[in-house]
């Protein structure tokens, strides 16, 4: 047991609780430490990983299989944003990631060194590359490839590979994106209470 404790100390693994008293997979990397809201106001799934220089806002959900690796620069996730299954978020030196409030990042997305505005939705399997900027209230379609340094204004539907803005979103679609982020806040709170591993 003493050897295990010594190994954990050497790895500098943080000790954050989630459902059923288990440990969330949240890690310091040397002097780079995740900044987290109060316990119960965020959730990191048991097999997701939050590493290093990462800031999580209030009511953020990091879902199964996702990796946020803040080794080279900052990853900042806004309030009530959800990062869905198997998403990869990474940074190069001097290319941080900023994701705004009330965002939905769909399954299997790749978010790398870019900025995503408030209340935006990134569809399943989309890729957004270094120094790209997505405005507020935007929808990046499933499978889209947003290339480096590309910028899009607020309220746009962005699709294709390479991605292009094809039209403005309707007020109804923007409201739907807000509802999506609110739903995922309710959902992670349900998982905190009800998720239990079968022994």
Locations of the language-model features?
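Short, Lys/Arg-enriched N-terminal segments with co-localized hydrophobic residues
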Residues: 5-23
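A positional/architectural concept
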Residues: 37-82, 86-91
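Glycine-rich hexapeptide-repeat left-handed beta-helix
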Residues: 19-39, 71, 77-79, 85-86, ...
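N-terminal hydrophobic alpha-helix used for membrane targeting or insertion
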Residues: 4-5, 140
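Intrinsic disorder/low-complexity signal
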Residues: 5, 20-21, 46, 58, ...
């Amino acid at each position: 047991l003493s050897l295990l404790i010594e190994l954990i100390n050497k790895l500098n693994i943080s000790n954050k609780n989630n459902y059923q008293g288990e440990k969330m997979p949240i890690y310091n990397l040397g002097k780079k430490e995740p900044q987290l809201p109060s316990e119960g106001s965020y959730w990191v799934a048991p097999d997701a990983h939050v590493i290093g220089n990462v800031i999580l806002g209030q009511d953020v959900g990091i879902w199964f299989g996702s990796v946020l690796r803040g080794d080279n620069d900052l990853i900042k996730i806004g309030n009530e944003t959800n990062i869905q299954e198997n998403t990869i978020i990474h940074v190069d030196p001097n290319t941080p990631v900023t994701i705004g409030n009330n965002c939905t990042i769909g399954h299997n997305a790749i978010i790398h060194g870019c900025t995503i505005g408030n209340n935006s939705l990134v569809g399943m399997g989309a890729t957004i590359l270094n120094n790209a900027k997505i405005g507020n209230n935007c929808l990046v379609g499933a499978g889209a490839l947003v290339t480096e340094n590309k910028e899009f204004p607020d309220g746009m539907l962005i699709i294709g590979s390479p991605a292009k803005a094809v039209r403005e979103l309707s007020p109804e679609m923007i409201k739907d994106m807000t509802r999506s982020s609110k739903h995922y806040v309710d959902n992670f709170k349900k998982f905190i209470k009800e998720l239990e591993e079968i022994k």
